[in-house]
Regions:
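Extracellular jelly-roll beta-sandwich "head" domains, especially the C-terminal globular C1q domain
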Residues: 1-130
């Protein structure tokens, strides 16, 4: 799947709902919840590239209610910045993966508009053979 934000995110500590769908043919990403649902066990690659504007940002990638990757970017006044992260994860059927802003509202500079994108992508590299 490959998805993006359509507007600035304002709510911390809940899954970010990426509603701009670039690719989601198998429908394993649910835009209403912001979560990827694993239907095929195996090794997955996830990445995110976020635009930072107006505030610092703290973003976590979660697997099954546990943060496994953290990204922090400090906003530089009057500039748009970028931050990114990527990880390989082994998933079982039923596992869920998502991104969320963590902390308080002071660290919620995650941004998107018609010329600045924030994206989240994931795909299966190898399925389990046993």
């Amino acid at each position: 799947f490959s998805v993006g934000l359509e507007t600035r995110v304002t709510v911390p500590n809940v899954p970010i709902r990426f509603t701009k769908i670039f690719y989601n043919q198998q429908n394993h990403y649910d835009g209403s919840t912001g979560k990827f649902y694993c239907n095929i066990p195996g090794l997955y690659y996830f990445s995110y590239h976020i635009t930072v504007y107006m505030k610092d940002v703290k973003v976590s990638l979660f697997k099954k209610d546990k943060a496994v990757l953290f990204t922090y970017d400090q906003y530089q006044e009057k500039n748009v910045d970028q931050a990114s992260g990527s990880v390989l994860l082994h998933l079982e059927v039923g596992d869920q993966v998502w991104l969320q802003v963590y902390g308080d509202g002071d660290h919620n500079g995650l941004y998107a508009d018609n010329v600045n994108d924030s994206t989240f992508t994931g795909f299966l590299l190898y399925h389990d053979t046993n």
